[in-house]
Amino acid sequence: MPFERCISNEDKEGDYFMKNIFSREELLIGKENVEKLKKSKVAVFGIGGVGSYVVEALARAGIGNFVLVDNDNIDITNINRQIIATTKTIGKAKVEVAKERILEINPDAKVNTYKEFYMPDNKIELTSNISYIVDAIDTVTAKIALIQEADALNIPIISSMGTGNKLEPTKFEVEDIYKTSVCPLAKVMRKELKNRGIKKLKVVYSKEEPIRLEINSNNKVPG
């Protein structure tokens, strides 16, 4: 049965979506926490192999406000690993396709998009009302700049390390940057962040040896 026939006009005009789409989640975490998610604002930098799945998961979890930052358009080579990439979205801006997916999941969500590269000389102004930042950027210098800004504004942030050229998903861990090992990107980041006085950073990284990977501060990170 088409979705339009499953809900009444009264449901469409009320808060049907938050009460029903996230009703199973409410059973798990409680109404108060569902409301917290609804009021939260998450900024995701980099809507690629990592960031696109982060956005999808957060939307389905009930996050109510998003800031999406990425300058890329979807390419045919993205289809094998990015959830926003299909034959119908090739050539479209990643941030706009991600926004459309969010609103298809939760029409009540608020989404601000920035089709820009986040770099030290081209920063998106962050505000204190951001609840959390997800760093899924693929350039080391940009990652460092974002982490520094989040630290200065006291905004919680989690950073994705290298995910490309790896095959074993069970090797991924959430850890502080200074407790990481094996990951070439994490090694570079530890050095750069230590030099800048950053004392801690939550990261997602893999202990799997990459098939082939060389990282320095000017490289893009496969993902």
Residue ranges and their predicted role:
Residues 60-65:
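Conserved S-adenosyl-L-methionine
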Residues 12-19, 38, 126-132, 137-145, ...:
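Glycine-rich phosphate/adenylate-binding loop
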Residues 115-122:
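Conserved SAM/SAH-binding loop
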